[in-house]
């Protein structure tokens, strides 16, 4: 995976945004946690931007890489691979950039206040990347982007529907976490990703070809905590 940029101007703006995020203290319960925004999020020149819910305790909060290092990440990697995509071709972020935990240290759903607090950062990320299509993963992410531009979509009724949204298109999909696969199986999610891939077929020029990596993800075994782990369901 790479955080390489083609535009030095965009690279500088992204670096400034990452620096700003690291100093955020808007959410008292989260401000001490890792802020998951860096070159490891993907390619800021991509035309495809995924928005998930939040860094998982055993995934991005541990690895620093969105949707990576736990069962949710494994599912996401498989969905990308099913359409012959690579992380180097897309950008991945979350509705909130810190891992929300309950009093027992387990993942919890972000509060509406936390989502609102982080919406400005989400908007800045989207504006910087300038994707042709924003793909939300799960109901929380779909709700979060409505803070930026209203859309009127509901995940259960509108999954895989594509609508104009701001200067981009919006496509709501289910989250690849273990719990979400109860409501929409991985088989169905593979079909959703196939539809997405058809929308951004290389011939359309929307999705970049895989560039030469400048930054490589560490092997899972090199990350504190060991091998890919089974995250508690979201």
Regions found by a protein language model. Name each.
Residues 210-224:
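A short, charged, Gly/Pro-tolerant segment at domain boundaries
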Residues 2-157, 162-202, 206-207, 218:
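A polyanion-binding, active-site-adjacent surface
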Residues 220-234:
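Long, low-complexity, intrinsically disordered segments
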């Amino acid at each position: 995976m790479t955080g390489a940029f083609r535009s030095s101007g965009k690279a500088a703006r992204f670096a400034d945004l990452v620096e700003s995020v690291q100093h955020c203290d808007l959410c008292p319960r989260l401000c001490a946690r890792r802020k998951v925004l860096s070159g490891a999020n993907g390619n800021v020149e991509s035309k495809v931007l995924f928005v998930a819910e939040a860094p998982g305790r055993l995934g991005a909060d541990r690895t620093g890489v969105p949707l990576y290092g736990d069962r949710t990440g494994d599912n996401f990697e498989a969905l990308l691979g099913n359409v012959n995509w690579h992380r180097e071709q897309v950008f991945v972020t979350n509705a909130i950039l810190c891992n929300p935990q309950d009093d027992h240290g387990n993942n919890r759903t972000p509060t509406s206040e936390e989502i609102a607090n982080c919406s400005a950062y989400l908007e800045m990320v989207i504006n910087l990347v300038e994707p042709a299509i924003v793909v939300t993963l799960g109901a929380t992410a779909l709700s979060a982007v409505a803070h930026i531009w209203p859309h009127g979509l509901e995940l259960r009724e509108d999954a895989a529907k594509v609508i104009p949204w701001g200067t981009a298109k919006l496509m709501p999909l289910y989250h690849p976490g273990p719990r979400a696969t109860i409501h929409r199986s991985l088989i169905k999610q593979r079909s959703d990703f196939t539809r997405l891939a058809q929308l951004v077929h290389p011939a359309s020029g929307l999705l970049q070809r895989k560039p030469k990596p400048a930054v490589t993800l560490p092997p899972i075994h090199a990350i504190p905590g060991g091998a890919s782990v089974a995250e508690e369901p979201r």
